[in-house]
Amino acid sequence: MSKAPVRVAVTGAAGQIGYSLLFRIASGEMLGKDQPVILQLLDLPQAQKAVKGVMMELEDCAFPLLAGMIATDDPNVAFKDAKVALLVGARPRGPGMERKDLLTENAKIFTVQGAAIGQYADPDCKVLVVGNPCNTNAYIAKEVAQKYGRVPAKNFTGMLRLDHNRALSQLAGKSGREVSSLKNLVVWGNHSPTMYADYRFVKSNGDSVKDLINDAAWNKDVFLPTVGKRGAAIIEARGLSSAASAANAAIDHIRDWVLGSNGEWVTMGIPSDGSYGIPEGVIYGFPVTTENGEYKIVQGLEIDEFSRERMTVTLNELLEEREGVKDLLA
C-alpha cells in the first residue's frame, strides 16, 4: 500500500536555496523514493508571483511523489500539519548592517514562525533552520514554540551539515582519500567562521586521517579558516551566496534524521543537553547518530586543550547572540 503524503513546509520558497531544494524534495531525495510529499510554500506577499512560477516548473517535472502544493504568505497556513519544516527564508545582511541589526531583524521573522509551528504544525514536526544566523534563529523559533507545549524543543535544529560537508571535501583533498571513505568527522558549535571542524577521530578504511595528514599547522592555518570562510569565498567568486550546496546539506540533514544515519556520525545543530560542558538549550553543533527519527549525541569523546579552546570561542559567540535577542523573547 502506498504511504500517506507528508506535508513539507519550506520558507523562502522563491529564493535561490529554495529553487535548488524543492525539486530534490519532490523527487524523493529527502524522505525516500516511496514517500509522497505535499509542498507548503511560504514567502513574502511580493514574492508570490515568483513562487507560482516555481510551482509551474514543479508541475512540469511530473514528479510521481508530488501529491500537492500550496503557496501562501501566511505562516499559519504554511505550517499547518507540517511534519517537516525547512526554514530557509531569512533577512540577508545588507551593506553597512551590523550583525546585531541582522539578529534583531531575523528575530522578528523567527518569532512569528516559531509561534506558527508551535500552534499549527504536526506535534512531531522536524524543524531545520537554514536561514542565518541559523543557530540563533533556531533558538528563537524553539523558545517561542515551547509556549504552546506541542512541538518538543529537541525538534528544532540548525544546519551545520554544510560546514560538515565542506570539511569532508577539504580532508579528502588533503589526505588523497575518497570522500565517501571518511567517517567520524565532528563540527562543533555555531554555523559561522568560529565553527570548529574536528578531524581527530576521522577514519578512512581504518586509517587515522589525522595521522595521514600529520600537519598541525595546516589544521590551524589552512583547514579551519578555509572551511569557516568558505561561504564568503563563494560569494566573492560567484557574486551570489552558496545556494545549491546549502540545499544539498539541508537534504542530507533531514534525510539522515528521518531515515537514519546507519550508525555514521553526522553533525546537527541541536539544543544542548549539557553534553561536553555546553550549557543546556543552546543550539550547538554536535556529532550525532540518528535512528527511527531520533538523534543521539556521540558521547565520551576526549576533548584536548586546542579543541576546548575552539569549542569555547564558538560557544561564546552563541551566548553573545542569545544575549542579543533575549529582550525580544521576553
From Swiss-Prot:
<dbReference type="InterPro" id="IPR010945">
    <property type="entry name" value="Malate_DH_type2"/>
</dbReference>
<protein>
    <recommendedName>
        <fullName>Malate dehydrogenase</fullName>
        <ecNumber>1.1.1.37</ecNumber>
    </recommendedName>
</protein>
<dbReference type="GO" id="GO:0006108">
    <property type="term" value="P:malate metabolic process"/>
</dbReference>
<feature type="binding site">
    <location>
        <begin position="12"/>
        <end position="18"/>
    </location>
    <ligand>
        <name>NAD(+)</name>
    </ligand>
</feature>
<keyword id="KW-0520">NAD</keyword>
<dbReference type="Pfam" id="PF00056">
    <property type="entry name" value="Ldh_1_N"/>
</dbReference>
<feature type="binding site">
    <location>
        <position position="166"/>
    </location>
    <ligand>
        <name>substrate</name>
    </ligand>
</feature>
<feature type="binding site">
    <location>
        <position position="93"/>
    </location>
    <ligand>
        <name>substrate</name>
    </ligand>
</feature>
<dbReference type="InterPro" id="IPR036291">
    <property type="entry name" value="NAD(P)-bd_dom_sf"/>
</dbReference>
<feature type="binding site">
    <location>
        <position position="106"/>
    </location>
    <ligand>
        <name>NAD(+)</name>
    </ligand>
</feature>
<feature type="active site" description="Proton acceptor">
    <location>
        <position position="191"/>
    </location>
</feature>
<dbReference type="GO" id="GO:0006099">
    <property type="term" value="P:tricarboxylic acid cycle"/>
</dbReference>
<feature type="binding site">
    <location>
        <begin position="130"/>
        <end position="132"/>
    </location>
    <ligand>
        <name>NAD(+)</name>
    </ligand>
</feature>
<dbReference type="InterPro" id="IPR015955">
    <property type="entry name" value="Lactate_DH/Glyco_Ohase_4_C"/>
</dbReference>
<dbReference type="InterPro" id="IPR001557">
    <property type="entry name" value="L-lactate/malate_DH"/>
</dbReference>
<dbReference type="InterPro" id="IPR001236">
    <property type="entry name" value="Lactate/malate_DH_N"/>
</dbReference>
<feature type="binding site">
    <location>
        <position position="132"/>
    </location>
    <ligand>
        <name>substrate</name>
    </ligand>
</feature>
<feature type="binding site">
    <location>
        <position position="113"/>
    </location>
    <ligand>
        <name>NAD(+)</name>
    </ligand>
</feature>
<keyword id="KW-0816">Tricarboxylic acid cycle</keyword>
<comment type="similarity">
    <text>Belongs to the LDH/MDH superfamily. MDH type 2 family.</text>
</comment>
<dbReference type="GO" id="GO:0030060">
    <property type="term" value="F:L-malate dehydrogenase (NAD+) activity"/>
</dbReference>
<feature type="binding site">
    <location>
        <position position="99"/>
    </location>
    <ligand>
        <name>substrate</name>
    </ligand>
</feature>
<dbReference type="Pfam" id="PF02866">
    <property type="entry name" value="Ldh_1_C"/>
</dbReference>
<comment type="function">
    <text>Catalyzes the reversible oxidation of malate to oxaloacetate.</text>
</comment>
<dbReference type="InterPro" id="IPR022383">
    <property type="entry name" value="Lactate/malate_DH_C"/>
</dbReference>
<keyword id="KW-0560">Oxidoreductase</keyword>
